[in-house]
Amino acid sequence: MLEADFVIIGSGSAGSAMAYRLSEDGKHSVIVIEFGGSDIGPLIQMPSALSIPLNMSLYDWGFASEPEPHLGGRVLATPRGKVIGGSSSINGMVYVRGHARDFDHWAEEGATGWGFADVLPYFKRMEDNDGGEDGWRGHGGPLHVQRGSRKNPLYGAFVEAGRQAGFELTDDYNGSKQEGFGPMEQTISGGRRWSAASAYLKPALKRKNVSLVKGFARRVIIENQRAIGVEIEAHKQIQVVKARREVIVAASSINSPKILMLSGIGPAEHLRENGIAVVADRPGVGRNLQDHMELYIQQESTKPITLNSVLNPFSKALIGAQWLFFKSGLGATNHFEAAAFVRSRAGVDYPDIQYHFIPAAVRYDGKAAAKSHGFQAHVGPMRSKSRGSVTLRSPDPKAKPVIRFNYMSHPDDWTEFRHCIRLTREIFGQSAFDAFRGQEISPGSHVQSDDDLDVFIRDHAESAYHPCGTCKMGRADDVTSVVDPECRVIGVDGLRVADSSIFPRVTNGNLNAPSIMTGEKASDHILGRTPLAPSNQEPWINPRWQVSDR
């Protein structure tokens, strides 16, 4: 029988970090259960190939939403990594911690000990920041963070246009000042994707006390209200991986609630409907699903300097060859090298809109490239009020769950997205883009009225692939909480959840960084260590926030 002190389900952002930290002192054995295969190969390791694994069943679980009623019945893909490193091996390699206020809101909502002062030391501990170490940034940690070269002049035009429009500039949105236009950070090292597997799991697996077990996690085995192991399917056989101390679920915001429900933890009525014996009635399991949505605002470029010139087989082959032999060139970046975090209106105290800018006009998944040279901004609101759910389709562990995001179900979502479109047009209309600006490709200059913008939003808004919140962390006496502030599943001993599913609220940006931080901090709770000393750093808040949006 396979057996270890700690059994972790999932080798993603949080799971890999926990495998590394729980085994670090050599006193405890760790087994990581992962259904996916190897991350070796250029399709994952070459940063510019980022859209390819998203569309491959080899690396992606292939989840999709139910038809979304507020998006004309569209079904939206929900990629989650089915590979060593989890979603950190198929994501966009964008590194965003989130705003300090995000974590303070977590604490206010019952996640005591997870305010910004508490989590900043863990962000610092995990970082190997190219820019060095200070009160805000870390250096020497497992996760390499860099900035792109920003050689293409369109990156500079985007940042300058933000300044011309009256917005702030920021040299480090992961430092004291998130608000503003500036460089974007990447989890890339030496021209390669630097996933959680590269940073944490592979170094951990070199230790004698860490093992990786390839298998499909069916459920957590619970006896007398205590988790004692995990039932897996491996080599077409059902096996048990026994946990001497604890089981930690880190299987993503989609799979983590599914595994809990299959184990008898969740809304009692829903479990009974599926013929599952109730171990712990936790109504919050699978609820509180959140995500970011975004639109692509695309503009023709009058100069042939965009990436559209290399979106052909011959150019891709040359780029691939240069990357393969030298780990350099256009293949060695994700091309997200300029960013912005801005506030939508006066009275909003910290940014609620995020921009990714790239010198190309093409969908994030690599499809539907524009016919001409172009550039685009990915833009979307960061704090949607819409909430969704993940439920069981059947008691069969192999059945994909029912995912209902309820995108755009709150009226404010529509107001915010209309503003995002109009604001992007204002930015692209600044003189910094005069030398490059052609016709608007998308939505198109004819799309102006609220009604027309709403049609465009309904037909074209996409997930930014940041699902979270389905095993919410909070007070033990809150019926909507699934785990307490030490990541312990309420009502079951020896069982924790630690990944993006425990976020009470979605953070202000991409989720890889806060997911890794969650694994880092959860490890100290699991080991019974005193948490790292809180920081006394104070974030920059725009002094004009009450009277101006910039």
UniProtKB/Swiss-Prot annotation:
One of its GO terms (biological process) is glycine betaine biosynthetic process from choline. Keywords: FAD, Flavoprotein, NAD, Oxidoreductase. The active site is at H466 (proton acceptor). Gene3D superfamilies: FAD/NAD(P)-binding domain, Glucose Oxidase, domain 3. FAD binds at residues 5-34. Pathway: Amine and polyamine biosynthesis; betaine biosynthesis via choline pathway; betaine aldehyde from choline (cytochrome c reductase route): step 1/1. Its EC number is 1.1.99.1, 1.2.1.8. Its cofactor is FAD. GO terms for molecular function: betaine-aldehyde dehydrogenase (NAD+) activity; choline dehydrogenase activity; flavin adenine dinucleotide binding. It catalyses: choline + A = betaine aldehyde + AH2; betaine aldehyde + NAD(+) + H2O = glycine betaine + NADH + 2 H(+). Residues 529-550 are annotated as: Disordered. InterPro entries: BetA (IPR011533), FAD/NAD-bd_sf (IPR036188), GMC_OxRdtase (IPR012132), GMC_OxRdtase_N (IPR000172), GMC_OxRtase_C (IPR007867). Belongs to the GMC oxidoreductase family. Involved in the biosynthesis of the osmoprotectant glycine betaine. Catalyzes the oxidation of choline to betaine aldehyde and betaine aldehyde to glycine betaine at the same rate. This is Oxygen-dependent choline dehydrogenase.
